[in-house]
């Protein structure tokens, strides 16, 4: 790799490589997919406070891209495993790269701290696979009292399209619930642009997809 995008450099991974006049440029589009999916639902991460559950690949990409795109505060919660240490390393990088974004990392075994951080957050993100088929009966949030009318709840899980987390958040009256299927679409849109230099006909794709799901 000759160069890396800011997100790829901070994360230390790429999923899209573009040859620009003989120079190989590495990009990471997962976080872009998340941010653009939110924008597609009328939500901008700029100026927002987020709580992200998980510290795996998808959660890390989301954390980094949201910081780069202007989030003011990100609280990461993960079990006490090697991913927790990696999250702390990423947070340290972001402190240098994006000093205006306050990134903190917490262990998930402190439900009181999790509730406290969600109470201060604008957006709650499930960046784990909890709730993915065949475990649709699971949710990363067991205390439904954290849901409130002005909280936006997002899930990276795309199957089912509405997870238990999103369903319970909606039933509790949360402002918006956003599933993970759109994240897949928008990271593909970003990759399409990088590969071709053209804008992907997103609305045509959405129409085609809707017609073929009937």
Features from the language model and the residues they span:
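Phosphate/diphosphate ligand-binding glycine-rich loop within oxidoreductases
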Residues: 1-41
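Short helix-loop-beta connector
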Residues: 20, 43-49, 147-149
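Glycine-rich adenosine-cofactor-binding loop
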Residues: 28, 47-67, 71, 78-79
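Active-site glycine-rich loop that binds ribose-phosphate moieties when present
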Residues: 33-38, 44-45, 57-64, 93
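Structural beta-sheet core signal
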Residues: 52, 76, 153-155
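NAD(P)-binding Rossmann-fold cofactor-contacting core
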Residues: 69-99
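Rossmann-like adenosine-cofactor binding region
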Residues: 100-177
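Adenosine-phosphate binding glycine-rich loop
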Residues: 152, 156-214
